[in-house]
From Swiss-Prot:
Gene3D superfamilies: Actin-related protein 2/3 complex subunit 5 (1.25.40.190)
SUPFAM superfamilies: Arp2/3 complex 16 kDa subunit ARPC5
Keyword set includes Cytoplasm: yes
Compartment(s) of residence: Cytoplasm, Cytoskeleton; Cell projection
Lineage: Eukaryota, Metazoa, Chordata, Craniata, Vertebrata
GO biological process terms, semicolon-separated: Arp2/3 complex-mediated actin nucleation; cell migration; regulation of actin filament polymerization
Main function: May function as component of the Arp2/3 complex which is involved in regulation of actin polymerization and together with an activating nucleation-promoting factor (NPF) mediates the formation of branched actin networks.
Organism: Bos taurus (Bovine)
Self-association state and partner proteins as the record states: May be a component of the Arp2/3 complex in which it may replace ARPC5.
Name of one Pfam family that matches: P16-Arc
GO molecular function: actin filament binding
Keywords: Actin-binding, Cell projection, Cytoplasm, Cytoskeleton, Phosphoprotein
Name of the protein this chain belongs to: Actin-related protein 2/3 complex subunit 5-like protein
């Protein structure tokens, strides 16, 4: 019995490791390990400079940060998508919207409504054009799915 009380193995445990005030979100760790979520701004800018609007549009919607809680990442992705949407000609919008599936249209609608929350110069008029075309393709169901969704962009 005296042998167990003199043991010093308990001193090897770092109790600060188990501090409840040191909370780290598992989703943020997974996102950091997987790389930066959201669209790649350099890829999208390169496609915009080349004039390939449709590929830039799909690249901007790819890897959207829906599951992350980091607002800076979401704001950066919103800026990239808004840049692509404002660079489109109004005659090309319908073709771009029709190239999306149902989930893509819902994601586009999320970005449109997010853009309505924080309007910039001339963005509201462009977003209204996109909203009109997305509503024509996606129907009222896309609006309902966006407004009731828990995961935001």
């Amino acid at each position: 019995m005296a042998r167990n009380t003199l043991s010093s193995r308990f001193r090897r445990v770092d109790i600060d490791e188990f501090d409840e005030n040191k909370f780290v979100d598992e989703q943020e760790e997974a996102a950091a390990a997987a790389g930066e979520p959201g669209p790649d701004p350099s890829e999208v800018d390169g496609l915009l400079r080349q004039g390939d609007m449709l590929r830039a549009f799909h690249a901007a919607l790819r890897n959207s940060p829906v599951n992350t809680k980091n607002q800076a990442v979401k704001e950066r992705a919103q800026g990239v998508v808004l840049k692509v949407l404002t660079n489109f000609k109004s005659s090309e919008i319908e073709q771009a919207v029709q190239s999306l599936d149902r989930n893509g249209i819902d994601l586009l609608m999320k970005y449109i409504y997010k853009g309505f929350e924080k309007p910039t110069e001339n963005s509201s008029a462009v977003l209204l054009q996109w909203h009109e075309k997305a509503l024509a393709v996606g129907g009222l169901g896309s609006i309902i799915r966006v407004l009731t969704a828990r995961k935001t962009v």
